[in-house]
Amino acid sequence: MKKRLIALVLVTLMVLPLAACGKKEEVKDVDFYELRTKMLEAGENLPDMQTASSADDNAAELLGYVSDMDYEKVSNFFVSYSSEGLTDEIVVIAVKNEDDAKEAKESLEKHLTHRKNLFANYSPVEGAKLENAILRVVGRYVYLIIADDRNAIEKAFNEMVK
Amino acid sequence: MKSNGFKITCVVIVAVLLLAGVGTSICYSLKSYKAINEYVKEMHEKEEPEETQENDVTIAGSYKIRSTEAISDAYKSGDTSALDDKQKETLDMASKILDEIITDGMSDYEKEIAVYDWMCKNLANDSNLLVVIPAGSGDTDNPYGVLKYHNAVCVGYATTFRLFMQMMDIECMVIHNTECYHSWDLVKIDGDWYHTDIYSDVGRGQYAYFNMTDAMRSSQESWDTSYFPAATSMKRNKAMENIIECAGLSDIPGAIGQSIMDGNLSFVMKFSCEVNEEFARRAIAVIDIFSNAIDTISFPNGGGMWMNGYRWLPNDDGGFVLWVSVYKYGEEEDNSDALTEEERDEITSAIYEMINTIQEKLGGNGEGEGGIYDNPDGSDDGEFEDDNVDGVEDSDDSEGEDDSEGEE
């Protein structure tokens, strides 16, 4: 009886923290170059795109254009953007610790607001696309997709990461 | 004995759980305290907005408005000893341009137009402004880079225009909007201040953003009116040079259409009928419909146009005028050879018929008398008459109402 009770208490103690933390989303580690390629391929109507990524020498500086989060917390990222100054943009940030995903999302929200303000002042017609932007967190990944083919691009992301 | 052991075990477990609970509570409290502190600090910062100033303001997060008075002072005094090499080169470039475009005896207004024309013709908008990670073209926000590379962002246009004005002893300020996303100029001509935004006119409209009043500018932007001087005079506004005399509501569609075709994207309509509150509202309602229709215009290369602003403004003669500004983006392609002469005549005829129908609906006589649009070939064959009034109901009531309101 005593052993059973102790076992029950111990099991409860083990399970409680899991319940408190909630269920974490299972995601795969992916090759970022491949992820970027697949997502860009899915965007059939994307204009000419340039890419900056964690592979660049000045990666921390480049990420600073879209996110003000501490680069030490980032394990990988890429930013693909229209070289002609259109709104089209794909950003994926993988953080080292899943708890920092929220911070990454908030930083991309700020970036999106900045882009909306910029286009409202300089190119309102093109800026309309920003209203349909997709910004989501999946596990330790955060992604922002601004494109006509946003659903197809998001699907390509999910197929690789989930 | 067995019972005692069980009790001790239970007490230990409860004690451990309580300790864990207390520990967790302390951790969460500390975390919450930190978060609240940060929030309070953030709110405190938000409550104390920075004081408005003309210079040392960063626009769109990247471009800084800097004073260029050292250069204009050196131009006026002829003493360049206080300038660095970059400033000397800027002065040299700016002086050469003024020598080229300014002639003796020009008024301040004529000088302003000369500079505006030169800038609109010779400078181009830097597309880097909208690129997420801009390529390093540099110096697009100051006269040195603008005059050297002829590529500018809004701050570059504004500071370069101000430099020219200050070199000629014309008062000028660089003004920015409340959100710090755009900047343009306030220039004082013959004792009155006006808004001039060359960035928005380059490659688009002729003088659409030239010498605007506060009322006109506030259609597009907001700014700190307690800091920047008020611009209320219509005297040197370009739209006032494009006055279209209208008899009543029925002249509005033709006036707008003709002005756009003539390339006057900023113009005013002056009415010979009484402009009372009811008439003013009805006129705005007509332009609302036009505004929606113009939004649908698109050029084959992706360009188009929209109504940038329209409102009643007090005229310097004590009356009111209706100001309209149309914004055009992209370039129209020359498709003049795409239609045969016969097709062109037929379509032109149909369009005039349609406009006459609109005029009729608004209370005009629909036969061209006094209207802005007259069918150039004088024909009234009615070929397109029915086809072009689909969806527009003939309503005696509405005609009657408009007759009483819109015409003299």
Q: Predicted segment positions?
A:
Chain A
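Bacterial N-terminal signal peptides that target proteins for export
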Residues: 1-9
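C-terminal motif of bacterial Sec signal peptides marking the signal peptidase cleavage site
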Residues: 17-20
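Bacterial signal peptide processing site
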Residues: 22-24
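Extracytoplasmic/secreted envelope proteins and their assembly/folding machinery
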Residues: 32-36, 101, 105-109, 154, ...
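Short, compositionally biased low-complexity segments enriched in polar/charged residues
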Residues: 51-87, 99, 103, 130-131
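Second-shell loop/turn segments in exported
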Residues: 89-97, 141-146
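Short Gly/Thr-rich strand-loop-strand
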Residues: 98-137
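A short, solvent-exposed beta-edge/loop patch
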Residues: 125-162
